[in-house]
Design a protein with these regions (language model features):
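Solvent-exposed, non-transmembrane regions of membrane-associated and secreted proteins
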Residues: 4-144
Length: 144
């Protein structure tokens, strides 16, 4: 039986690791593109379903619960728009890891009580470009 040199083992292991890294990178790009396409489809549906707010007739306290719209089995509370980086995405009513693969999610709080926290992946099509924002850039959340 022939002895395998340590150098050959290192070369083969290096090639395998490079292929694995390339595959992981390709999968991440696919997931990013898929999430972006799905979010844009939902945003178009949301914009058609957005209710026109009725003028308030009572001077009572505002209900902090955000109204939801259901699309394809997921509930959405609004839309986030960041024109400086070309972001216009739906926001899901509750967060979970599987939901984050579709669109940004409300982690907690409400826009009506000024404590809304939105979480999203760092996909290029989601919040991946936030680092390029500058002070004064507009960020708008529109609820249902």
């Amino acid at each position: 039986m022939r002895k395998v040199s340590p150098g050959l083992v290192c070369i083969v292991l290096g090639v395998v690791l490079l292929l694995a890294a390339g595959g992981l990178g390709a999968y991440n790009r696919y997931e990013d593109a898929h999430a972006g396409a799905e979010a844009q489809t939902v945003v178009a549906d949301l914009q058609q379903k957005v209710e026109t707010p009725e003028p308030e007739t009572e001077s009572g306290p505002l209900d902090p619960e955000l109204p939801v719209v259901e699309i394809d089995g997921n509930e959405y509370v609004g839309e986030i728009s960041i024109p400086a980086i070309g972001i216009d995405l739906p926001v899901m009513s509750e967060w979970s890891y599987p939901r984050l693969k579709i669109a940004p999610c409300r982690q907690f709080g409400s826009s009506r009580t000024d404590d809304l926290v939105i979480a999203a992946h760092n996909y290029e099509s989601h919040f991946g470009k936030l680092t390029s924002l500058t002070a004064g850039d507009s960020v708008t959340f529109t609820d249902m």
